[in-house]
UniProtKB/Swiss-Prot annotation:
GO CC terms, sorted: chloroplast thylakoid membrane; photosystem I
UniProt cross-references to PANTHER family, sorted A to Z: OUTER MEMBRANE PROTEIN, OMPA-RELATED, PHOTOSYSTEM I P700 CHLOROPHYLL A APOPROTEIN A1-RELATED
Any one Pfam family match given in the protein's UniProt record, by short name: PsaA_PsaB
Source organism: Gossypium hirsutum
Protein name: Photosystem I P700 chlorophyll a apoprotein A1
């Protein structure tokens, strides 16, 4: 008799055909809500429809159904991303000067859009060099294509078609995993499996395949391009992949194949997996061999990380155990209960992810210029400025989103009865101490940082430069930052014995990399001016955090409104007859936080734009003399408010203001138009609902007189809606104004 061990139970993790596919609901706007589905009585209906269409919490309280909707929506989002990417590659294939740019990237600007000659708009097609007329683009796609080894517009065309196929696939997946095979709640809550797949699959194998592509395709093609070989003469990507001898001609160790890997003789691969540091003097970008090495190392780390968590085989970490073991001497129950929060509240989960991704995006912004990863990126000043600005804005929005969803979690998902003495409960119990201290810090930073500028403005007006805070009078040197710079400068050969240059040229040392007579990067000096503006950064960031954190910590209750949780995430005031309780909802804190986020990011991108033009970007003569765009005026001009207004905003706005009649004229119109959108927002922010309701009623009276009154009763926007419309136009107008100002300036002078 054979004794068999019992067969392990196979878990069924999907439900088959849970929701039938039907287009009928598409014809019923608001089908997800009994109230909205009735159709409009007043114009408020359309606003409620938009506010609640994607608020899956309000459609059902079934967590499994909510999870499936979110999961399906993610596939829809991926589909749109693939569609967008396909459009970018298609523009590169069909409307761009990519092949011309590839042959001479220092003298030809990137362009992938040619405006049709309708009512004189062809003026926008500027001469970007090489006889091509079009709009100069600043997205960095050309540089990334060159780094990936794309040598022809046909390859871009094929990639665009591939992306369309993937877009269709994602749309199908979104439908399939909601209507045909929808995962059960247990599948969404299986965090160990998710970690394994995301770490080992997405990040590990993703990085490994990119490293493989770089070694087998990008490196050889870029080596030929750097040597000046005509792109049409270079072998195609598949030839390098299929024919090892081609690679062995460039990198002799390729002839040995995988033998050095299995015999642990890894130094043989040092030809194409390097650890040099610094920039490639030909392209002004990081060494592509360094980048390949980096992705290989990252892949190994994540492949290991992806095998650390316990799934079907009974070994490995369990996340619940890790969290519950996490107790400090002063933290009570510690992280006990956090596992349950993060597996049942997707708002809590999303909040953490947004905070991390937002911070990471800002880190990306700072690395894109200090360690420019793609060839000829560093000398394309318009693209450098655009990438920095873009990633700063995106990071700011994501971080505010983190606070928004943390507050929604507090209002909708937090259960105070089951939480006692864990970290979150302890934070909530001493929230007054946190917020009052943070408030004190904001007041201190605000008065002192701004006070230094006001002092300088006053001394400047009185003609007493010797009494100003500046590099030539009373110095306030950023000694800590300079010490960090110095430490990194000295690292190669000392604490980083294998590296030949420091991680970034910005740290210091005498090195300067110029490509085609333009500065790519050089050591960035920090002085009193930077010390002053960095404290403005500290101030604006702390105020943003104060507003957002107060919104989260007081989302459920406060001394003013003890039952705030019952009023929900967004509400205008605590009912009629209770004065002084407006703008206290968690939503209002997000609303106010957005303005301070806008403040913070604006100061950062202004600082970056001026500092780079003053101290980094410029031209270099045959004798090695560097001439910066604004001639190093940052250190002495930016130490007064007047200097910022006069020598940055006003002086550098001349290009956008005088752009009419040139190929930059669209930026001039955008500059005006975006100012208008911004000003339009003030109408929503500075007036109350009653004013508009009164106005609407007299307009309705006139319509009734003429017997043209609509069946749907017009209503003024609610207080919350008015604020939402206001902040949207404020941010859109402000961002588009900045965009036009920056680009007209940098394309004209850069």
């Amino acid at each position: 008799m054979i004794i068999r061990s019992p067969e392990p139970e196979v878990k069924i993790l999907v439900d088959r055909d849970p929701v039938k596919t039907s287009f009928e609901e598409w014809a019923r706007p608001g089908h997800f809500s009994r109230t909205i589905a009735k159709g409009p009585d007043t114009t408020t209906w359309i606003w409620n429809l938009h506010a609640d269409a994607h608020d899956f919490d309000s459609h059902t309280s079934d967590l499994e159904e909510i999870s499936r909707k979110i999961f399906s929506a993610h596939f829809g989002q991926l589909s749109i991303i693939f569609l967008w990417l396909s459009g970018m590659y298609f523009h590169g294939a069909r409307f761009s000067n990519y092949e011309a740019w590839l042959s001479d990237p220092t003298h030809i600007g990137p362009s992938a859009q040619v405006v049709w000659p309708i009512v004189g708009q062809e003026i926008l097609n500027g001469d970007v060099g090489g006889g091509f007329r079009g709009i100069q683009i600043t997205s960095g796609f050309f540089q990334i294509w060159r780094a990936s080894g794309i040598t022809s517009e046909l390859q871009l065309y094929c990639t665009a078609i591939g992306a369309l196929v993937f877009a269709a696939l994602m749309l199908f997946a979104g439908w399939f995993h909601y209507h045909k095979a929808a995962p059960k709640l247990a599948w969404f809550q299986d965090v160990e499996s998710m970690l394994n797949h995301h770490l080992a699959g997405l990040l590990g194998l993703g990085s490994l395949s990119w490293a493989g592509h770089q070694v087998h395709v990008s490196l050889p093609i870029n080596q030929f391009l750097n040597a000046g070989v005509d792109p049409k003469e270079i072998p195609l990507p598949h030839e390098f992949i299929l024919n090892r001898d081609l690679l062995a001609q460039l990198y002799p160790s390729f002839a040995e194949g995988a033998t050095p890997f299995f015999t642990l003789n890894w130094s043989k691969y040092a030809e194409f997996l390097t650890f040099r540091g610094g920039l490639d003097p030909v392209t002004g970008g990081l060494w592509l061999t360094d980048i390949a090495h980096h992705h290989l190392a990252i892949a190994i780390l994540f492949l290991i990380a992806g095998h650390m968590y316990k799934t079907n085989w009974g070994i490995g970490h369990s996340l619940k155990d890790i969290l519950e073991a996490h107790k400090g001497p002063f933290t009570g129950q510690g992280h006990k209960g956090l596992y349950e929060i993060l597996t049942t509240s997707w708002h809590a989960q999303l909040s953490l992810n947004l905070a991390m991704l937002g911070s990471l995006t800002i880190v990306v912004a700072h690395h894109m210029y200090s360690m420019p990863p793609y060839p000829y990126l560093a000398t394309d000043y318009g693209t450098q400025l655009s990438l920095f600005t873009h990633h700063m804005w995106i990071g700011g929005f994501l971080i505010v989103g983190a606070a928004a969803h943390a507050a929604i979690f507090m209002v909708r998902d937090y259960d105070p009865t089951t939480r006692y003495n864990d970290l979150l409960d302890r934070v909530l119990r001493h929230r007054d101490a946190i917020i009052s201290h943070l408030n004190w810090v904001c007041i201190f930073l605000g008065f002192h940082s701004f006070g230094l500028y006001i002092h300088n403005d006053t001394m400047s007006a009185l003609g007493r430069p010797q009494d100003m805070f500046s590099d030539t009078a009373i110095q306030l040197q950023p000694v800590f930052a300079q010490w960090i710079q110095n430490t990194h400068t000295l690292a190669p050969g000392a604490t980083a014995p294998g590296a030949t240059a420091s991680t970034s040229l910005t740290w210091g040392g005498g090195d300067l990399v110029a490509v085609g007579g333009k500065v790519a990067l050089l050591p960035i000096p920090l002085g009193t001016a930077d010390f002053l503006v960095h404290h403005i950064h500290a101030f604006t960031i702390h105020v943003t955090v104060l507003i957002l954190l107060k919104g989260v910590l007081f989302a459920r209750s406060s001394r003013l409104i003890p039952d705030k949780a019952n009023l929900g995430f967004r509400f205008p005031c605590d009912g009629p007859g209770r004065g002084g309780t407006c703008q206290v909802s968690a939503w209002d804190h997000v609303f106010l936080g957005l303005f301070w986020m806008y403040n913070s990011i604006s100061v950062v991108i202004f600082h970056f734009s001026w500092k780079m033009q003053s101290d980094v970007w410029g031209t270099i003569s045959d004798q090695g003399v560097v001439t910066h765009i604004t001639g190093g005026n940052f250190a002495q001009s930016s130490i007064t408010i007047n200097g910022w207004l006069r020598d940055f905003l006003w002086a550098q706005a001349s290009q956008v203001i005088q752009s009419y009649g040139s190929s930059l004229s669209a930026y001039g119109l955008l500059f005006l138009g975006a100012h208008f959108v911004w000003a339009f927002s003030l109408m929503f922010l500075f007036s109350g609902r009653g004013y508009w309701q009164e106005l609407i009623e007299s307009i309705v009276w006139a319509h009734n007189k003429l017997k043209v009154a609509p069946a749907t009763q017009p209503r003024a926007l609610s207080i919350v809606q008015g604020r939402a419309v206001g902040v949207t136009h404020y941010l859109l107008g402000g961002i588009a104004t900045t965009w036009a100002f920056f680009l007209a300036r940098i394309i004209a002078v850069g």
